[in-house]
Design a protein with these regions (language model features):
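Sec-dependent N-terminal signal peptides
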Residues: 4-13
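Structured catalytic-domain cores with a bias toward divalent-metal coordination
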Residues: 1-4, 17-524
Protein backbone atom coordinates (compact mmCIF):
# COMPACT_ATOMS: atom_id res chain seq x y z
CA UNK A 1 0.00 0.00 0.00
CA UNK A 2 1.14 3.53 -0.73
CA UNK A 3 0.63 6.31 1.75
CA UNK A 4 -2.16 8.76 0.92
CA UNK A 5 -0.81 11.19 -1.68
CA UNK A 6 -0.40 14.69 -0.34
CA UNK A 7 -2.23 17.10 -2.62
CA UNK A 8 -0.94 20.58 -3.50
CA UNK A 9 -2.67 21.93 -0.39
CA UNK A 10 0.26 20.45 1.52
CA UNK A 11 2.92 22.46 -0.25
CA UNK A 12 4.44 25.25 1.84
CA UNK A 13 2.20 28.26 1.31
CA UNK A 14 4.49 30.95 -0.04
CA UNK A 15 3.55 34.57 0.61
CA UNK A 16 3.36 37.11 -2.18
CA UNK A 17 6.64 38.58 -3.33
CA UNK A 18 7.84 41.19 -0.86
CA UNK A 19 5.60 40.05 1.97
CA UNK A 20 6.79 38.71 5.28
CA UNK A 21 8.43 35.30 5.06
CA UNK A 22 9.38 32.89 7.81
CA UNK A 23 12.86 31.41 8.15
CA UNK A 24 11.86 28.09 6.50
CA UNK A 25 10.29 29.99 3.60
CA UNK A 26 13.47 32.00 3.09
CA UNK A 27 15.80 28.99 3.33
CA UNK A 28 13.90 26.22 1.52
CA UNK A 29 13.10 24.66 4.91
CA UNK A 30 16.79 24.45 5.86
CA UNK A 31 16.28 26.04 9.29
CA UNK A 32 13.75 27.19 11.85
CA UNK A 33 13.13 30.68 13.22
CA UNK A 34 15.07 32.15 16.12
CA UNK A 35 13.35 34.03 18.92
CA UNK A 36 14.51 37.33 17.39
CA UNK A 37 13.12 36.33 13.99
CA UNK A 38 9.73 35.48 15.47
CA UNK A 39 9.56 38.89 17.15
CA UNK A 40 10.68 40.62 13.95
CA UNK A 41 8.07 38.71 11.92
CA UNK A 42 5.29 39.81 14.26
CA UNK A 43 6.56 43.39 14.26
CA UNK A 44 6.55 43.38 10.47
CA UNK A 45 2.89 42.31 10.42
CA UNK A 46 2.04 45.20 12.74
CA UNK A 47 4.03 47.62 10.57
CA UNK A 48 2.17 46.41 7.51
CA UNK A 49 -1.14 47.27 9.15
CA UNK A 50 -2.22 43.69 9.66
CA UNK A 51 -4.71 44.62 12.37
CA UNK A 52 -3.21 42.46 15.08
CA UNK A 53 -2.17 43.31 18.60
CA UNK A 54 1.10 41.90 19.93
CA UNK A 55 1.73 41.70 23.66
CA UNK A 56 3.94 39.86 26.11
CA UNK A 57 2.55 36.80 27.83
CA UNK A 58 5.43 36.73 30.30
CA UNK A 59 9.18 36.38 30.61
CA UNK A 60 11.15 33.14 30.38
CA UNK A 61 13.58 32.01 33.12
CA UNK A 62 16.47 33.38 31.03
CA UNK A 63 14.78 36.74 30.49
CA UNK A 64 13.25 36.34 27.02
CA UNK A 65 9.84 37.75 26.20
CA UNK A 66 7.05 35.33 25.32
CA UNK A 67 4.91 37.11 22.72
CA UNK A 68 1.21 36.63 22.19
CA UNK A 69 -0.94 37.86 19.31
CA UNK A 70 -4.60 38.85 19.25
CA UNK A 71 -6.02 38.52 15.73
CA UNK A 72 -9.55 39.89 15.41
CA UNK A 73 -11.61 41.86 12.88
CA UNK A 74 -12.60 44.31 14.13
CA UNK A 75 -9.97 44.35 16.87
CA UNK A 76 -11.29 43.78 20.38
CA UNK A 77 -10.18 45.79 23.37
CA UNK A 78 -9.94 42.78 25.64
CA UNK A 79 -11.62 39.60 26.89
CA UNK A 80 -14.99 41.19 27.65
CA UNK A 81 -15.41 42.60 24.15
CA UNK A 82 -14.26 39.29 22.67
CA UNK A 83 -17.02 37.50 24.60
CA UNK A 84 -19.61 40.06 23.53
CA UNK A 85 -18.72 39.49 19.88
CA UNK A 86 -20.25 36.02 19.99
CA UNK A 87 -17.35 34.66 17.94
CA UNK A 88 -15.49 31.55 19.09
CA UNK A 89 -12.27 32.60 20.84
CA UNK A 90 -9.49 30.14 20.02
CA UNK A 91 -6.14 30.00 21.84
CA UNK A 92 -3.31 28.35 19.86
CA UNK A 93 0.18 27.76 21.22
CA UNK A 94 3.28 26.25 19.62
CA UNK A 95 6.85 25.39 20.58
CA UNK A 96 6.12 24.17 24.11
CA UNK A 97 8.71 21.50 23.24
CA UNK A 98 11.14 23.72 21.40
CA UNK A 99 12.76 21.01 19.28
CA UNK A 100 9.33 20.38 17.75
CA UNK A 101 9.55 23.35 15.45
CA UNK A 102 6.89 23.17 12.74
CA UNK A 103 4.05 24.37 14.96
CA UNK A 104 5.86 27.68 15.45
CA UNK A 105 6.36 28.14 11.71
CA UNK A 106 2.85 27.03 10.77
CA UNK A 107 1.30 29.39 13.32
CA UNK A 108 3.29 32.33 11.94
CA UNK A 109 2.02 31.47 8.46
CA UNK A 110 -1.55 31.26 9.70
CA UNK A 111 -1.27 34.64 11.43
CA UNK A 112 -0.01 36.20 8.21
CA UNK A 113 -2.80 34.64 6.16
CA UNK A 114 -5.47 35.64 8.68
CA UNK A 115 -4.38 39.26 8.64
CA UNK A 116 -2.85 40.14 5.26
CA UNK A 117 -3.55 37.01 3.21
CA UNK A 118 -6.30 34.81 1.85
CA UNK A 119 -7.77 33.80 5.21
CA UNK A 120 -8.82 37.29 6.30
CA UNK A 121 -12.51 36.48 6.06
CA UNK A 122 -12.10 33.88 8.82
CA UNK A 123 -11.65 36.70 11.32
CA UNK A 124 -15.22 37.76 10.56
CA UNK A 125 -16.25 34.63 12.46
CA UNK A 126 -13.48 33.74 14.92
CA UNK A 127 -10.97 35.45 17.23
CA UNK A 128 -7.49 33.93 17.49
CA UNK A 129 -5.11 34.22 20.44
CA UNK A 130 -1.72 32.91 19.32
CA UNK A 131 1.48 32.12 21.25
CA UNK A 132 3.93 30.98 18.55
CA UNK A 133 7.09 30.59 20.67
CA UNK A 134 5.94 29.45 24.10
CA UNK A 135 9.27 27.90 25.15
CA UNK A 136 11.55 30.78 24.18
CA UNK A 137 14.60 29.55 26.10
CA UNK A 138 14.36 26.04 24.71
CA UNK A 139 14.06 27.49 21.22
CA UNK A 140 17.40 29.29 21.59
CA UNK A 141 19.28 26.24 22.92
CA UNK A 142 20.16 25.34 19.35
CA UNK A 143 22.13 22.21 18.65
CA UNK A 144 22.32 19.35 16.18
CA UNK A 145 18.98 17.65 15.67
CA UNK A 146 20.76 14.31 15.97
CA UNK A 147 21.23 15.21 19.64
CA UNK A 148 18.25 17.48 20.39
CA UNK A 149 15.59 15.66 18.32
CA UNK A 150 16.97 12.28 17.17
CA UNK A 151 14.77 10.70 14.53
CA UNK A 152 13.10 13.95 13.47
CA UNK A 153 13.37 14.55 9.73
CA UNK A 154 14.85 18.07 9.66
CA UNK A 155 15.87 20.75 10.10
CA UNK A 156 19.47 19.98 11.02
CA UNK A 157 19.60 22.40 13.98
CA UNK A 158 16.81 22.78 16.55
CA UNK A 159 16.28 23.78 20.16
CA UNK A 160 15.66 21.65 23.24
CA UNK A 161 12.52 20.10 24.69
CA UNK A 162 12.87 21.55 28.25
CA UNK A 163 12.62 25.20 29.23
CA UNK A 164 15.48 27.23 30.69
CA UNK A 165 15.00 25.57 34.09
CA UNK A 166 15.13 22.07 32.65
CA UNK A 167 11.37 21.48 33.03
CA UNK A 168 9.11 19.81 30.51
CA UNK A 169 6.49 22.54 30.20
CA UNK A 170 3.87 20.03 29.13
CA UNK A 171 4.11 18.29 32.50
CA UNK A 172 3.84 21.53 34.49
CA UNK A 173 0.17 22.49 34.39
CA UNK A 174 -0.61 21.23 37.91
CA UNK A 175 2.65 21.95 39.76
CA UNK A 176 3.22 25.31 37.98
CA UNK A 177 6.97 25.49 38.62
CA UNK A 178 7.75 27.40 35.42
CA UNK A 179 7.10 31.10 34.80
CA UNK A 180 5.81 30.18 31.33
CA UNK A 181 3.07 28.05 32.90
CA UNK A 182 2.09 30.68 35.43
CA UNK A 183 1.92 33.36 32.74
CA UNK A 184 -0.13 31.26 30.34
CA UNK A 185 -2.60 30.20 33.03
CA UNK A 186 -3.12 33.86 33.95
CA UNK A 187 -3.74 34.64 30.28
CA UNK A 188 -6.20 31.76 29.92
CA UNK A 189 -8.01 32.85 33.08
CA UNK A 190 -8.30 36.41 31.77
CA UNK A 191 -9.47 35.54 28.25
CA UNK A 192 -11.34 32.29 29.03
CA UNK A 193 -11.11 31.04 25.41
CA UNK A 194 -13.70 28.64 24.06
CA UNK A 195 -11.08 26.41 22.47
CA UNK A 196 -7.43 25.60 23.20
CA UNK A 197 -4.94 24.11 20.72
CA UNK A 198 -1.38 22.90 21.36
CA UNK A 199 0.93 22.12 18.41
CA UNK A 200 3.53 19.33 18.69
CA UNK A 201 5.56 16.75 16.75
CA UNK A 202 5.43 13.01 17.41
CA UNK A 203 8.29 11.11 19.02
CA UNK A 204 7.07 7.65 18.31
CA UNK A 205 5.81 5.03 15.93
CA UNK A 206 6.14 4.71 12.16
CA UNK A 207 2.63 5.18 10.81
CA UNK A 208 0.87 6.41 7.69
CA UNK A 209 -0.53 9.77 8.80
CA UNK A 210 0.62 13.34 8.21
CA UNK A 211 -0.65 14.29 11.65
CA UNK A 212 -2.30 12.74 14.68
CA UNK A 213 -4.53 14.56 17.12
CA UNK A 214 -6.25 14.17 20.47
CA UNK A 215 -8.91 15.83 22.58
CA UNK A 216 -8.36 16.14 26.30
CA UNK A 217 -8.11 12.61 27.69
CA UNK A 218 -9.11 13.07 31.33
CA UNK A 219 -12.16 10.84 31.92
CA UNK A 220 -14.06 13.72 33.56
CA UNK A 221 -15.68 14.37 30.19
CA UNK A 222 -17.25 17.80 29.88
CA UNK A 223 -19.90 18.54 27.24
CA UNK A 224 -17.31 20.60 25.33
CA UNK A 225 -14.56 17.99 25.32
CA UNK A 226 -16.92 15.12 24.55
CA UNK A 227 -18.14 17.08 21.53
CA UNK A 228 -14.56 17.69 20.40
CA UNK A 229 -13.78 13.99 20.62
CA UNK A 230 -16.96 12.64 19.09
CA UNK A 231 -17.78 15.29 16.48
CA UNK A 232 -15.37 18.17 15.88
CA UNK A 233 -12.15 16.23 15.32
CA UNK A 234 -13.85 13.57 13.23
CA UNK A 235 -15.35 16.21 10.94
CA UNK A 236 -12.03 18.06 10.69
CA UNK A 237 -10.44 14.72 9.84
CA UNK A 238 -12.94 14.14 7.03
CA UNK A 239 -12.35 17.63 5.66
CA UNK A 240 -8.58 17.16 5.65
CA UNK A 241 -8.86 13.79 3.96
CA UNK A 242 -10.70 15.46 1.09
CA UNK A 243 -7.72 17.83 0.84
CA UNK A 244 -5.26 14.91 0.74
CA UNK A 245 -4.12 15.09 4.36
CA UNK A 246 -4.40 11.82 6.28
CA UNK A 247 -4.88 12.18 10.06
CA UNK A 248 -5.81 9.87 12.93
CA UNK A 249 -6.29 9.92 16.73
CA UNK A 250 -2.91 10.23 18.45
CA UNK A 251 -1.15 7.08 19.64
CA UNK A 252 1.68 4.63 19.13
CA UNK A 253 1.88 0.97 18.28
CA UNK A 254 2.33 -1.37 21.22
CA UNK A 255 4.85 -3.35 19.17
CA UNK A 256 6.35 -2.17 15.87
CA UNK A 257 7.57 -5.60 14.78
CA UNK A 258 5.72 -6.17 11.47
CA UNK A 259 4.12 -9.42 12.66
CA UNK A 260 3.09 -7.82 15.98
CA UNK A 261 1.47 -4.58 14.83
CA UNK A 262 -1.99 -6.04 15.43
CA UNK A 263 -1.35 -5.94 19.19
CA UNK A 264 -2.74 -2.44 19.15
CA UNK A 265 -2.50 1.35 19.03
CA UNK A 266 -2.48 3.21 22.35
CA UNK A 267 -2.69 6.87 23.37
CA UNK A 268 -0.82 8.71 26.14
CA UNK A 269 -1.72 9.52 29.76
CA UNK A 270 -4.88 11.17 31.09
CA UNK A 271 -3.44 13.41 33.82
CA UNK A 272 -3.98 17.18 33.70
CA UNK A 273 -0.24 17.78 34.14
CA UNK A 274 -0.57 17.77 30.32
CA UNK A 275 -2.04 21.03 29.06
CA UNK A 276 -4.56 19.52 26.68
CA UNK A 277 -5.95 17.26 29.41
CA UNK A 278 -6.30 20.12 31.88
CA UNK A 279 -7.99 22.38 29.34
CA UNK A 280 -10.31 19.58 28.26
CA UNK A 281 -11.82 19.68 31.75
CA UNK A 282 -13.21 23.18 31.13
CA UNK A 283 -13.34 23.96 27.37
CA UNK A 284 -12.73 22.57 23.86
CA UNK A 285 -9.21 21.15 23.82
CA UNK A 286 -7.17 19.88 20.86
CA UNK A 287 -3.66 18.44 20.68
CA UNK A 288 -1.87 18.33 17.30
CA UNK A 289 1.10 16.02 16.61
CA UNK A 290 2.77 16.33 13.20
CA UNK A 291 4.54 13.18 11.97
CA UNK A 292 8.23 13.49 12.89
CA UNK A 293 9.41 11.26 10.03
CA UNK A 294 7.96 13.58 7.40
CA UNK A 295 10.28 16.27 6.01
CA UNK A 296 10.23 19.61 7.83
CA UNK A 297 8.41 21.39 4.99
CA UNK A 298 5.69 18.74 4.93
CA UNK A 299 5.24 18.91 8.69
CA UNK A 300 4.78 22.68 8.53
CA UNK A 301 2.20 22.28 5.80
CA UNK A 302 0.37 19.47 7.63
CA UNK A 303 0.17 21.51 10.82
CA UNK A 304 -0.97 24.61 8.95
CA UNK A 305 -3.66 22.57 7.19
CA UNK A 306 -4.89 21.16 10.49
CA UNK A 307 -5.00 24.56 12.20
CA UNK A 308 -6.81 26.17 9.27
CA UNK A 309 -9.32 23.32 8.94
CA UNK A 310 -10.06 23.49 12.67
CA UNK A 311 -10.49 27.27 12.62
CA UNK A 312 -12.79 27.02 9.60
CA UNK A 313 -14.92 24.39 11.30
CA UNK A 314 -15.24 26.38 14.51
CA UNK A 315 -15.99 29.55 12.54
CA UNK A 316 -18.77 27.73 10.69
CA UNK A 317 -20.40 26.43 13.89
CA UNK A 318 -20.40 29.35 16.37
CA UNK A 319 -23.78 28.54 17.89
CA UNK A 320 -22.72 24.96 18.60
CA UNK A 321 -19.43 26.14 20.10
CA UNK A 322 -21.29 28.55 22.38
CA UNK A 323 -23.83 25.90 23.38
CA UNK A 324 -21.24 23.28 24.33
CA UNK A 325 -19.07 25.76 26.19
CA UNK A 326 -22.14 27.11 28.01
CA UNK A 327 -23.16 23.56 28.96
CA UNK A 328 -19.66 22.96 30.29
CA UNK A 329 -19.71 26.18 32.32
CA UNK A 330 -23.13 25.29 33.73
CA UNK A 331 -22.31 21.66 34.53
CA UNK A 332 -22.12 20.80 38.22
CA UNK A 333 -21.30 17.08 38.42
CA UNK A 334 -21.93 15.43 41.78
CA UNK A 335 -18.70 13.41 41.64
CA UNK A 336 -15.18 13.65 40.23
CA UNK A 337 -13.12 10.79 38.81
CA UNK A 338 -9.77 10.98 40.60
CA UNK A 339 -8.12 7.86 39.18
CA UNK A 340 -8.31 6.35 35.74
CA UNK A 341 -7.42 3.44 33.49
CA UNK A 342 -7.59 2.81 29.77
CA UNK A 343 -11.09 2.19 28.47
CA UNK A 344 -11.79 -1.07 26.63
CA UNK A 345 -10.41 -0.88 23.08
CA UNK A 346 -12.34 -0.44 19.90
CA UNK A 347 -11.36 -2.23 16.69
CA UNK A 348 -10.18 -0.08 13.80
CA UNK A 349 -7.87 -0.11 10.80
CA UNK A 350 -4.62 1.79 11.39
CA UNK A 351 -2.08 2.53 8.65
CA UNK A 352 1.39 1.35 9.68
CA UNK A 353 4.71 1.86 7.97
CA UNK A 354 6.56 -1.43 8.02
CA UNK A 355 9.83 -0.93 9.89
CA UNK A 356 12.81 -3.16 10.56
CA UNK A 357 14.93 -3.63 13.65
CA UNK A 358 17.67 -1.03 14.16
CA UNK A 359 19.02 -1.98 17.56
CA UNK A 360 16.47 -0.09 19.71
CA UNK A 361 13.84 -2.78 20.10
CA UNK A 362 10.25 -2.76 18.91
CA UNK A 363 8.38 -0.59 21.42
CA UNK A 364 6.14 2.24 20.36
CA UNK A 365 8.89 4.87 20.62
CA UNK A 366 11.81 2.79 19.28
CA UNK A 367 13.75 4.19 16.34
CA UNK A 368 13.76 1.65 13.53
CA UNK A 369 14.71 1.28 9.87
CA UNK A 370 12.06 2.59 7.47
CA UNK A 371 10.98 0.63 4.39
CA UNK A 372 8.52 3.01 2.72
CA UNK A 373 5.94 0.22 2.71
CA UNK A 374 2.58 1.07 4.30
CA UNK A 375 0.06 -1.50 5.42
CA UNK A 376 -3.49 -1.22 6.83
CA UNK A 377 -3.77 -3.34 9.97
CA UNK A 378 -6.92 -4.09 11.93
CA UNK A 379 -6.11 -3.77 15.62
CA UNK A 380 -7.41 -2.71 19.04
CA UNK A 381 -7.32 1.09 19.40
CA UNK A 382 -7.10 2.40 22.96
CA UNK A 383 -7.72 6.14 22.90
CA UNK A 384 -10.02 6.81 25.87
CA UNK A 385 -10.00 6.49 29.64
CA UNK A 386 -12.52 5.49 32.29
CA UNK A 387 -12.54 6.39 35.94
CA UNK A 388 -11.52 3.78 38.51
CA UNK A 389 -12.20 5.86 41.62
CA UNK A 390 -14.85 8.52 42.08
CA UNK A 391 -15.26 10.94 44.96
CA UNK A 392 -18.36 12.95 45.77
CA UNK A 393 -17.93 16.65 45.14
CA UNK A 394 -18.85 18.54 48.32
CA UNK A 395 -20.32 22.01 48.62
CA UNK A 396 -16.85 23.33 49.43
CA UNK A 397 -13.34 22.37 50.44
CA UNK A 398 -11.50 24.12 53.25
CA UNK A 399 -7.81 24.71 53.96
CA UNK A 400 -6.18 26.23 57.00
CA UNK A 401 -4.52 29.62 56.53
CA UNK A 402 -1.03 28.07 56.44
CA UNK A 403 -1.72 26.57 52.99
CA UNK A 404 -1.49 29.87 51.11
CA UNK A 405 0.91 28.32 48.56
CA UNK A 406 -1.81 25.88 47.54
CA UNK A 407 -4.28 28.74 47.27
CA UNK A 408 -1.86 30.50 44.90
CA UNK A 409 -1.90 27.41 42.67
CA UNK A 410 -5.70 27.39 42.67
CA UNK A 411 -5.95 31.08 41.90
CA UNK A 412 -3.57 30.76 38.95
CA UNK A 413 -5.77 27.97 37.63
CA UNK A 414 -8.66 30.41 37.73
CA UNK A 415 -10.39 28.80 40.72
CA UNK A 416 -12.36 31.16 42.97
CA UNK A 417 -11.17 31.03 46.59
CA UNK A 418 -12.69 32.78 49.60
CA UNK A 419 -11.67 33.38 53.22
CA UNK A 420 -13.91 33.21 56.25
CA UNK A 421 -14.42 36.63 57.75
CA UNK A 422 -15.37 35.17 61.12
CA UNK A 423 -15.04 31.89 63.00
CA UNK A 424 -17.60 29.19 62.22
CA UNK A 425 -18.58 25.92 63.86
CA UNK A 426 -20.33 23.16 61.95
CA UNK A 427 -19.99 19.71 60.37
CA UNK A 428 -16.61 19.14 58.65
CA UNK A 429 -15.41 15.93 56.96
CA UNK A 430 -11.77 14.81 57.04
CA UNK A 431 -9.74 12.31 54.99
CA UNK A 432 -7.87 9.74 57.06
CA UNK A 433 -4.53 8.65 55.56
CA UNK A 434 -3.90 4.90 55.69
CA UNK A 435 -0.59 5.00 53.81
CA UNK A 436 1.70 7.44 52.02
CA UNK A 437 3.82 6.26 49.11
CA UNK A 438 6.70 8.40 47.82
CA UNK A 439 7.55 7.46 44.26
CA UNK A 440 10.16 8.26 41.67
CA UNK A 441 11.92 11.55 41.05
CA UNK A 442 10.19 13.37 38.21
CA UNK A 443 10.38 16.96 37.00
CA UNK A 444 11.95 18.20 40.24
CA UNK A 445 9.47 16.37 42.49
CA UNK A 446 9.01 12.98 44.17
CA UNK A 447 5.55 11.89 43.15
CA UNK A 448 3.28 10.99 46.07
CA UNK A 449 0.22 8.79 46.24
CA UNK A 450 -1.89 8.16 49.31
CA UNK A 451 -4.46 5.61 50.40
CA UNK A 452 -7.30 6.47 52.71
CA UNK A 453 -10.93 7.51 52.86
CA UNK A 454 -13.29 10.28 53.89
CA UNK A 455 -14.98 9.98 57.26
CA UNK A 456 -18.38 11.20 58.35
CA UNK A 457 -18.70 14.93 58.92
CA UNK A 458 -18.24 15.88 62.57
CA UNK A 459 -18.66 19.19 64.42
CA UNK A 460 -15.53 21.30 64.17
CA UNK A 461 -14.50 24.93 64.42
CA UNK A 462 -12.94 26.86 61.55
CA UNK A 463 -11.19 30.10 62.55
CA UNK A 464 -11.50 33.38 60.72
CA UNK A 465 -9.07 33.42 57.80
CA UNK A 466 -9.71 29.79 56.82
CA UNK A 467 -9.64 29.33 53.04
CA UNK A 468 -12.89 28.15 51.46
CA UNK A 469 -13.12 26.75 47.91
CA UNK A 470 -16.78 26.55 46.79
CA UNK A 471 -17.41 23.97 44.07
CA UNK A 472 -20.42 25.78 42.58
CA UNK A 473 -18.20 27.67 40.14
CA UNK A 474 -16.82 27.55 36.59
CA UNK A 475 -13.83 25.37 37.59
CA UNK A 476 -15.41 23.49 40.46
CA UNK A 477 -14.57 20.08 39.00
CA UNK A 478 -10.96 21.12 38.37
CA UNK A 479 -10.72 22.30 41.98
CA UNK A 480 -12.11 18.98 43.20
CA UNK A 481 -9.67 16.99 41.08
CA UNK A 482 -6.55 18.80 42.27
CA UNK A 483 -7.62 18.98 45.94
CA UNK A 484 -8.91 15.44 46.45
CA UNK A 485 -6.23 13.57 48.45
CA UNK A 486 -6.53 10.39 46.37
CA UNK A 487 -6.24 12.18 43.03
CA UNK A 488 -3.66 10.63 40.72
CA UNK A 489 -2.43 14.04 39.51
CA UNK A 490 -3.39 16.62 42.11
CA UNK A 491 -1.58 18.85 44.55
CA UNK A 492 -0.91 15.91 46.87
CA UNK A 493 0.85 14.13 43.99
CA UNK A 494 3.19 17.09 43.50
CA UNK A 495 4.32 17.44 47.14
CA UNK A 496 2.35 20.53 48.14
CA UNK A 497 1.00 18.81 51.26
CA UNK A 498 4.07 16.73 52.11
CA UNK A 499 4.74 18.27 55.50
CA UNK A 500 1.36 17.06 56.77
CA UNK A 501 1.31 13.57 55.25
CA UNK A 502 1.82 10.60 57.55
CA UNK A 503 -0.15 7.39 58.08
CA UNK A 504 -3.17 7.64 60.40
CA UNK A 505 -3.09 11.45 60.19
CA UNK A 506 -5.82 13.57 58.64
CA UNK A 507 -5.16 15.17 55.27
CA UNK A 508 -5.11 19.02 55.31
CA UNK A 509 -7.92 19.23 52.74
CA UNK A 510 -11.34 19.00 54.40
CA UNK A 511 -14.92 19.10 53.11
CA UNK A 512 -18.10 20.97 53.89
CA UNK A 513 -21.60 19.95 52.83
CA UNK A 514 -22.97 23.45 53.36
CA UNK A 515 -21.48 26.92 53.17
CA UNK A 516 -20.68 28.63 56.48
CA UNK A 517 -23.22 31.29 57.43
CA UNK A 518 -20.55 33.89 58.22
CA UNK A 519 -19.10 36.68 56.07
CA UNK A 520 -16.73 35.50 53.35
CA UNK A 521 -14.26 37.49 51.26
CA UNK A 522 -12.80 36.74 47.85
CA UNK A 523 -9.07 36.03 47.68
CA UNK A 524 -7.68 38.33 44.97
Amino acid sequence: MRRLTLLPALAIVLPPLGAQRTAPERTDAARTSTHAEVLAFLDSLVARGAGIRVGTLGTSPQGRSIPYVVAARPMVSGPAEAKRSGKPVVYIQANIHAGEVEGKEALLQVLRELTVGDLRSLLDSVIVLAVPIYNADGNEAFGPATRNRPGQNGPDVVGLRPNGQGFDLNRDYIKQDAPETRASLAFITAWDPDAWMDLHTTNGSYHGYALTWSPGLNPNRTPANAWVQDTVLEQVRARLRREGVATYPYGNFMDQTPDSLAKGWITYESGPRFGSNLMGMSRLSILSEAYSNDPFATRIASTRAFVVATLRWLAEHPAEVRAHVAATIAARPDSVLVRSAFAPPRQDTVIAEISLAAGQGSGGFARRQRTGEFRPVVMPVIDRFVGTRAEAIPTAYVLEAQWSDVVELLRRQGVVVERLGAAWTGPVAAFRLDSVNVGRQFEGHRLVSVAGSWGEARPDSLPAGTFLIPTDQRLGMVAAFVLEPASEDGYTTWNYFDRALRPRAMHPVRRLDRLPDVPRHLVP
